[in-house]
Amino acid sequence: MNTSAVPILEVQAVSRYFGKFQALHNITTRFKAGELTAIIGPNGAGKSTFFNVISGGIAPSSGTVHFEGRDISSMAQHNYARAGIAKSFQITNVFKHLSAHENVRVALQMQTSRYQIFRPRAVYAELSDKADALLVKVGLANSRSKLAGDLAHGQQRSLEVAMALACGPKLLLMDEPTAGMSPQETVVMMDLISQMAAERTIILVEHKMKLVMGLCKRLLVLHHGELLAEGSPDDIRSNADVKRVYLGQN
């Protein structure tokens, strides 16, 4: 994996307004290729807004976002996958009336020539094999034929991850990947994230402090829309400002 000093994602002087309310205040930071980074902060810190800006959900009011040196600040969200960026959102987004295998196959088909009406049978066989491989990767091989709507919540989240991986992303953005999960499901998801981090850059938003402290190499702490601190878990634990506004609340 490329672990050079060149950032895979660079946020430069980003601010975001909603009317007169300023949700993000002049945030500048870089994300290195190969790093697993968590964005944390108390409620109202601006985490969701920041995630939406870097994932293309909303454009910054000022400042820029660059992916591999390319300005993506105003890129249409549907072009992110082709650029090499995949997203997994807090609210599970799967086709509940389709099987787990069909969900992943649909995601794979969207990455191929979508305007080709007639495809060789071999192409479908290849897509099916790739879908099976992704289901194995996320631990859903035994649920291949189950309807997505019949899967447990944690399994649906894992299925969504498989769909996100269908585009072979260099960067995976995850919003609250363990939201609504049982302790057992959380362990499974965090293990999956750890495995994926060996192959790609991951940026996630997460409220469960103990999980990110033990999993991530780097943390960003937001507070009232400002970047309060960034660094290793040890750096964040020892930061007096972080203790005051966030860690001290738990």
Protein language model annotation of sequence segments:
Residues 2-250:
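Glycine-rich phosphate-binding loops of nucleotide-dependent enzymes
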